[in-house]
Regions:
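A short, acidic, amphipathic alpha-helical segment used as a generic capping/interface helix at domain edges
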Residues: 196-210
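Hydrophobic beta-strand segments of well-ordered beta-sheets in folded domains
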Residues: 33-37, 211-220, 248-251
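A short acidic Gly-Thr/Ser loop motif
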Residues: 40-42, 155-156, 163-172, 176-179, ...
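Nucleotide/phosphate-binding catalytic cleft detector across ATP-hydrolyzing
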Residues: 1-34, 39-161, 210, 235-240, ...
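Nucleotide-binding motor/catalytic cores of P-loop/tubulin-like NTPases across gene-expression machines
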Residues: 181, 225, 236-275
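Conserved structured catalytic cores and adjacent interaction surfaces
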Residues: 158-159, 181, 215-217, 266-268
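Glycine-rich phosphate-binding loops at beta-strand->alpha-helix junctions
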Residues: 213-241
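Short glycine-rich, Thr/Ser-proximal phosphate-binding strand/loop in the N-terminal lobe
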Residues: 1-2, 51-60, 179-196
Length: 289
């Protein structure tokens, strides 16, 4: 914990010293109004759930109905801070609907993505960043939740896919069907290549018991590891999970997939994680959040 706090202090000092002048040149001001901070495993957890609305008579689907449903079904986890509870999909009368509010329905469902962060870690991070930037608007979010949502913005035409988000301690697996998250699973990341593939295969096997698996896999990992992990998945006998001799397509997500979608300094080296954070923040701002 002491080392983590010191690392955060060094990061904050560096951003103030080097980032403020860059910001001044780019937008004419070096001040910060809000901070988005991504926190990864083992300090975060992400889950997805679906809630349903059914009435005997047709009803108008409203933001108030959604807010009431989210609040009434939300859960508290001891020693965990809920940092995100987003409605990421809406189904009216059996059809996925992008602009559902104000429309009439007989039945509806909402898909909710919820993120928790270890309370002590979140409070320490928020307190330190508020002190550095003199703003109360510090928003922590679970890293894999952010990246899952950013991938949807980066590849809007891939409506069915698996997303593998690999960090040093774990691999999160998200299943997207018809542009909706329907399942999230967690596999331990192991140093041994065979163990990592085995753990991922085990989680995919469990998901396949409930849903058909899409043929596209997006692989998110550090640039130094992504090529090796892509080869491991390519060499694994995954076809049996798809009941096919043809293996699924494994797409290693690279900075080049995202860089055209966000504005960045010409002198900066593309960093995939920062690009995905920027894309996420940009999309949320466009949605008025």
């Amino acid at each position: 914990e002491v080392l983590a706090n010191r690392a955060l202090e060094l990061l904050g000092e560096t951003l103030l010293r080097e980032g403020a002048p860059v910001l001044m040149r780019a937008v004419g001001s070096g001040s910060i109004e809000s901070v988005l901070v991504s926190i990864d495993a083992p300090w975060q957890k992400t889950s997805v759930r679906t809630e349903h609305f059914e009435q005997t008579e047709p009803f108008v689907f409203t933001r108030g109905l959604v807010a009431e449903k989210v609040a009434s079904t939300s859960i508290k986890v001891p020693e965990q801070l809920r940092v995100d509870e987003s409605v990421i999909g809406t189904i009216l009368n059996g059809y996925e609907t992008r602009n559902p509010y104000g429309k009439e329905a007989n039945r509806a469902s909402i898909v909710i993505l919820t993120s928790f962060i270890d309370e002590r870690v979140a409070e320490a991070v928020i307190s330190m960043l508020r002190g550095f930037y003199h703003t109360k608007n510090v928003r922590p979010i679970a890293g894999n939740s952010l990246r899952f949502q950013a991938i949807r913005y980066a590849f809007p035409h891939e409506r069915d896919a698996l997303i593998l988000d690999v960090t040093d301690s774990s691999t999160s697996i998200a299943l997207v069907r018809r542009d909706l998250f329907v399942a999230i699973a967690e596999a331990t990341s192991a140093e041994e290549n065979d163990s990592w593939v085995k753990n991922v295969t085990s989680e995919l096997t469990d998901i396949a018991k409930h849903y058909p698996l899409p043929r596209t896999i997006f692989l998110l990992a550090r640039e130094t590891k992504v090529e090796s992990l892509q080869k491991q998945l390519g060499a694994a006998d995954l076809g049996k999970l798809w009941l096919s001799d043809d293996p699924p397509k494994v797409v290693a997500v690279l900075p080049s997939h995202v860089s055209a979608l966000v504005r960045q300094s010409p002198s900066s080296s593309p960093d995939l994680l920062l690009l995905l954070m920027t894309l996420f923040a940009q999309a949320r701002e466009g949605q008025g959040e």
